From Swiss-Prot:
NCBIfam families: TIGR00149_YjbQ
Species name: Schizosaccharomyces pombe (strain 972 / ATCC 24843) (Fission yeast)
Family assignment from sequence similarity: Belongs to the UPF0047 family.
Identification of the protein by name: UPF0047 protein C4A8.02c
One GO CC term, this protein: nucleus
UniProt cross-references to SUPFAM superfamilies, sorted A to Z: YjbQ-like
Record-linked PANTHER family: UNCHARACTERIZED PROTEIN YJBQ-RELATED, UPF0047 PROTEIN C4A8.02C
């Protein structure tokens, strides 16, 4: 059993849902050497999250953004506003979606379904770079 951990910094992005699967895989060349295992992705931020969702239709990403804005509106009268009106809603959305994902590895590839991709959910309007800790645990190919 081998363990590899990498810290990946994603480019700055403003509010929205972004497919980042290829960005992550490109920065994890060791992934190809694992016959089986898991990889955990953990975002080190409280105003962004990680999720797995549909990759085919960009409208799903826009709809996710719109739905979360309705569930957690900026106009709810939050006490925590020191970093802007979008900050506290970003914290709530991040807590609802979550900071981490675990994906199986099969024959050197992420075992995602046909229509699945890993997505960054960025909840702040101003662009931010985001840091993700990636931990691979598994068996290497012979």
């Amino acid at each position: 059993m081998d363990v590899i951990q990498r810290i990946i910094t994603l480019d700055r992005r403003s509010k929205g849902f972004y497919i980042i699967t290829n960005d992550l895989v490109k920065k994890l060349p060791e992934l190809k050497s694992f016959s089986s295992g898991t990889v955990n992705f953990f975002i080190q931020h409280t105003s962004a999250a990680l999720t797995i969702n549909e990759n085919w239709d960009a409208d799903t990403r826009a709809d996710m953004n719109d739905i979360l804005d309705k569930i957690v509106p900026e106009s709810a009268g939050y006490r925590h506003t020191a970093e802007g009106l979008d900050d506290m809603p970003a914290h709530v959305k991040s807590s609802l979606i979550g900071p981490s994902l675990t994906v199986p590895i099969t024959n050197g590839k992420l075992s995602l379904g046909t229509w699945q991709d890993i997505q960054l959910a960025e909840f702040r309007r101003q662009p931010h770079s985001r840091t993700i800790v990636c931990t691979i645990i598994g068996l290497r190919s012979n």
